[in-house]
Design a protein with these regions (language model features):
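A charged, aromatic-enriched C-terminal amphipathic alpha-helix characteristic of glycosyltransferases
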Residues: 28-31, 301-333
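Membrane-proximal helix-turn-helix segments that form the acceptor-binding/catalytic region
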Residues: 110-130
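Carbohydrate-associated surface elements
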Residues: 136, 155
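Acidic anion/phosphate-binding donor-loop and adjacent secondary structure
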Residues: 156-173
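Conserved donor-binding/catalytic core segment of Leloir-type glycosyltransferases
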Residues: 176-192, 198-203, 209
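Nucleotide-sugar-dependent
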Residues: 244-254, 270, 275-276
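Short hydrophobic beta-strand element within catalytic cores of glycosyltransferases
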Residues: 265-268
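Conserved acidic donor-binding segment of nucleotide-sugar-dependent glycosyltransferases
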Residues: 280-290, 297-303
């Protein structure tokens, strides 16, 4: 049986793998990575690397030095971006990289960020294979020289999103008007475009809601909720529509994906890999905030079509697909 070491700078990934479950503090990218590690641990001896964790207040230089000194004994090393950029490479081992997306805004923050992204791009060429989450990023990674790039899509336990009659229950619990259409505008942060969406819809007769572990958009009068996973799914089911106008170049878009699993249609701007999700799911792509009211009206007037088309596309990405894709990848690598 092959041995695998999973390298992530995020402590929540390390702890989740040890505990065999996705812990609540995991973000979307973390959740994908943990899910992949847990899938592989059913067939291989997989251990998470404590040495790869970026400690609180640890300098990047110290992290870089410690990463270079780390020489794991595992036959296969799976690396997230920080370990890809900072780790050493041994010709006797196989290396797999995971890249969800690259963010040019972060890259231009400082010389350290520019150095990191340049080194990451250079080291992508040293990997035996690179995994990403959309055709958009597969093309982008190939352009910068990554080897053997494969797409394994975000996937979910589809049974957890099975429809039930809880729409009014959620609204009553969170004191939301039952007689108004409820629209989810995404994570409460400016990077997700919530300010612009609010401005475009503030004069419309809709109830808006946003979520996340922290309200990073507290100065707009939009209802904010911090929900556990089961309540989050109930919220998506209670919504009549999800809007995703992200300013980031998305890897995919798990919010949009989960909305479609909940039979909630999506309007989005289709940045990065989100375009593939919305286009193949026959959802509306809209770049102009001022056109959102018309787009919303179109979707709500034909909601059954958009819910059916969206669910038909995303339901194929279940855990059977995901687990088999990762296990087959490693089998081919050996």
């Amino acid at each position: 049986m092959s041995t695998i070491e999973w390298q992530s700078k995020a402590e929540v990934v390390y702890e989740s793998i040890l505990q065999g479950q996705i812990l609540p503090l995991s973000n979307g990218g973390n959740s994908y990575d943990i899910q992949a590690a847990l899938a592989l641990s059913t067939c291989y001896r997989l251990t998470p690397s404590k040495e790869a964790i970026l400690k609180i207040n640890e300098s990047f230089i110290n992290y870089f030095i410690q990463s270079k000194l780390n020489n794991p004994s595992a036959e296969i090393i799976i690396r997230e971006p920080y370990p890809i950029a900072c780790g050493s490479y041994d010709s006797t081992k196989k290396y797999v990289g995971i890249v969800h997306h690259l963010d040019p805004v972060i890259e231009n923050k400082s010389w350290k960020h520019r150095w990191y992204f340049n080194t990451l791009r250079k080291n992508l060429k040293k990997l035996d294979t690179t995994i990403t989450v959309s055709e958009y990023w597969k093309d982008e990674l190939i352009k910068i020289g990554a080897n053997n790039v494969n797409v394994i899509y975000n996937s979910f336990d589809v049974s957890k999103y099975a429809d039930d009659e809880i729409k009014n229950d959620f609204k009553e619990k969170h004191q939301i008007a039952i007689d108004k259409k409820l629209i989810y505008i995404g994570n409460a942060s400016k990077e997700k475009g919530v300010y612009e969406v609010y401005e475009a819809l503030k004069d419309q007769d809709y109830e808006l809601i946003m979520s996340g572990p922290v309200n990073n958009a507290p100065n707009i009068p939009v209802k904010y909720v911090n929900l556990n996973k089961s309540e989050y799914i109930k919220m998506l089911k209670a919504c009549d529509l999800t809007i995703s106008m992200s300013k980031m170049i998305e890897g995919w878009n798990r919010i949009a994906h989960e909305s479609l699993l909940c039979n909630t249609p999506v309007i989005g701007n289709g940045t990065g890999g989100m375009k593939e999700l919305l286009k193949k799911g026959n959802q509306i792509i809209e770049h102009d905030y001022n056109q959102l009211p018309l787009a919303i009206e179109k979707v709500l007037d034909n909601r059954s079509y958009y819910t059916s088309e969206g669910y038909k596309f995303v339901r194929r990405f279940d855990l059977t697909y995901f687990n088999e894709s990762w296990i087959n990848l490693i089998n081919q690598l050996k």
